[in-house]
Amino acid sequence: MGRTGDLENAEFFPMTRRRSTSGTSSRSSTDSGLSVDTAYLEDNKHNNFANGTSGLTDETKYRDVEDAEADVDEPFLPTSSKKLGSGSRTRQIFWALVILCLGGWVLALVLFLTHGRASSQTASETLQQQESDSGSTSAGRPVTLQQVLTGSWNPRAHAISWIAGPDGEDGLLVQRAEVDKEGYMRVDDIRSQEGDDVDSQSGRILIDKAAVRVNGETLMPTFTWPSPDLNKVLLMSNHEKNWRYSFTGRYWIFDVATQTAQPLDPSVPDGRVQLALWSPSSDAVVFVRDNNMYLRKLSSESVVSITKDGGEDLFYGIPDWVYEEEVITDKSVTWWSNDGKYVAFLRTNESAVPEFPVQYFVSRPSGKRPPPGLENYPEVRQIKYPKAGSPNPVVNLLFYDVEKDEVFPVDVPDDFPDDDRIIIEVLWASEGKVIVRATNRESDRVKVFLIDTKSRTGKLVRFEDIANLDGGWVEPSHYTKFIPADPSNGRPDDGYIDTVIHDGYDHLAYFTPLDNPDPIMLTTGEWEVVEAPSAVDLRRGIVYFVATKESPTQRHVYRVHLDGSNLQALTDTSKPGFYDVSFSDGAGYALLSYNGPSVPWQAIINTGGDEITFEKTIEKNPRLASMVETYALPTEIYQNVTIDGFTLQLVERRPPHFNPAKKYPVVFQLYNGPTSQRVDRKFTIDFQSYIASNLGYIVVTLDARGTGYSGRKVRCAVRGNLGHYEAHDQITTAKMWAKKPYVDETRMAIWGWSYGGFMTLKVLEQDAGETFQYGMAVAPVTDWRFYDSVYTERYMHTPEHNPSGYENSTITNVSALSKATRFLLIHGASDDNVHIQNTLTFVDKLDLLNVQNYDMHFYPDSDHNIYFHNAHFMIYERLSNWLINAFNGEWHQIANPVPEDSIWDSVKRSVPAFAH
């Protein structure tokens, strides 16, 4: 799960040829603000649903099983004491087939006249869809599952690595060429493309060829990091993945001038290194091996041991599993000071953290051969995994004085106790000062400390009691920017820009001096900044950021002065847009990425003046634009619903050639984890698009209460009671959709993965078969006491403080789930994130009450992403086929089975018209 995220009018636009590659095409729209009185819906319960009819499909391979039931195998023919002759048996079968065909013809005629769903479409029906279509007019092919799973619909995107020039130049970027080309790694100066009057440098090759020879060995670097002075490059080969962000490898120092390399630690050339970072002065590398920290000064081949007691339970400079997954979302907890004189790093002690065994039945991820006699036993990896309420790792901040070769802590007053401290950010200022942000275990109290490493003292400079402010929490973030003093530009003191809560929304605040708790607000309003600030132009005193100012579903780029004045948009806000941006070191240039709703594109722009005078498009995605012209894509309808006073964002995906006179099955797809977002304006062709385009079903996604970017009122409503309000919102919206004239209320399903899997089960539990007949839950949490402490307690408090909340959030009412027609459970057997314990204990509850209306599939050795062997392709095929069978009514046929004792019984079951 991990940390994986106001529109008044609904907009109707087809994802078809009417999209433009520039992202500026207009779209037809219609207003649609929906509200509902939930008390009314609670008093108007639906009756039990009849057996499902055959599903809406565009291809005959998804036809109902009725077509195959005429060919009955001989073992299922009736038996009696008198043996039937072949003629008698043939005549019986013949007349049964005649009756079956006549009944099927009559039934098909009735269903056709009443606009019922046929198992395949006729030409006149297809024409009728085209004529009544409100969106797509393309006669192209439907999206295929193979295309989605192989990334054929993924936009091509360039990730530019901006780098500061050795002499303060702005606009330098690092690029890597194809492996078989010369000039494998080079630094280019984007200023050289602006014009003759711009002072710039020519490109410089850092690594000529990808293959590097060291002591007779050929290396193929997986990752490369140039030194700040661009004279050396840190290479990593022999990559091995650890957790989500972390990995290990062999590291090398490459000399640009001689095009030669040497081991990072010449005494241990084959040692696997967990982390390596250049010093700002380019004369040293700090690295971690076997959980201990080391320093390699380039002036010597010897290595200095910074720590010596690191080991299985003690980490230096790198996070343990839970910090990597839920707090830092990175592989490093090591920070060089700006002058290269100090290194700050975390010491993580997880000796008190209980272990969870992850078993591997097919593979051996460790790469080790088992001892003789144990070849037939699974490999077990013991993970230090703190579940809710269990001991957390104890984390302390330490400092290393490079010149004195000394490690020291700094005690600060008013710090959190060891068992109630989460350090979420460390930021170096100037003159050896450090800003440290920490929270309590439940993430609802924030303390900001200012530490002076020279005097080895510290003090508390800010305290925020989030629990008393709005009852919510604070998310870990790592975007705080240090603003150095510059009296000539009106900044007499050092400061920093942080994201704070202001009138119920996340906004930017400028704190100066460093110990001033009262900021200058840079942004305000009923919208939020996102992962901000993006960059700061210190010369001009301008802050750049991305925000939801136009709509929670959009992202635009803005700038504002450090005094909070002159807020301006850099992107075109007159049209829906979802932008991302990365700035050069001095914020004079940027890579602007348009990610939707039209075909994505990328351009490099200059931002150093009042106007953008330079723009170079580096990606237009022509292949993707051509595919959009060729394929019949769903129509996306963005709107909002208002439930219990909360305005929530929603997108409905309609099949191509949508016909409002027909009735369509509906699939609700959700994630709905706290602060997450699934309803946005990005260009996305995914599994949901495949369902709408290829299977012909409507897909609805609602960001219910608890989701992000709509303000803290919406976000914090779920605290302490995960699943309750989110499920209520999904069910309420589904009841609204069930009343729409084009929706088949007898064929409604819901599905999700991870938190979405939890929500699928919670919805089915709360709904008890009234609205949703089907559900598909992948890797679900079923009891929050089984999930990791940092994530869970942020939103639920500890089990000790909130026992009733944990009980309410657990999937316990399996009797309610038994009222659904059927549901599907899927889990990776080696999931290190959401443990298979969740699904197995839930299945035990089903067993105890003899609940049998479910299917289950486990994927051996797959983690939370379910990729091992053929799992990635198979799981989506499984989901697709299961859903087709559900909407074709086949799961009705396996409920309460009875043996067939005559051909006539088979006929009656095959032709519902004869069953009455």
Swiss-Prot record:
Keywords: Aminopeptidase, Glycoprotein, Hydrolase, Membrane, Protease, Serine protease, Signal-anchor, Transmembrane, Transmembrane helix, Vacuole. The keyword Hydrolase applies. Coiled coil: none annotated. One of its GO terms (cellular component) is plasma membrane. Glycans are attached at N349, N640, N808, N813. The active site is at S754 (charge relay system), D831 (charge relay system), H864 (charge relay system). One of its GO terms (biological process) is proteolysis. The keyword Ubl conjugation does not apply. One of its GO terms (molecular function) is serine-type peptidase activity. It catalyses: Release of an N-terminal dipeptide, Xaa-Yaa-|-Zaa-, from a polypeptide, preferentially when Yaa is Pro, provided Zaa is neither Pro nor hydroxyproline. It is a single-pass type II membrane protein. Residues 21-35 have a biased composition (Low complexity). Its EC number is 3.4.14.5. Belongs to the peptidase S9B family. Type IV dipeptidyl-peptidase which removes N-terminal dipeptides sequentially from polypeptides having unsubstituted N-termini provided that the penultimate residue is proline. This is Probable dipeptidyl-aminopeptidase B. It comes from Aspergillus flavus (strain ATCC 200026 / FGSC A1120 / IAM 13836 / NRRL 3357 / JCM 12722 / SRRC 167). The gene is dapB.
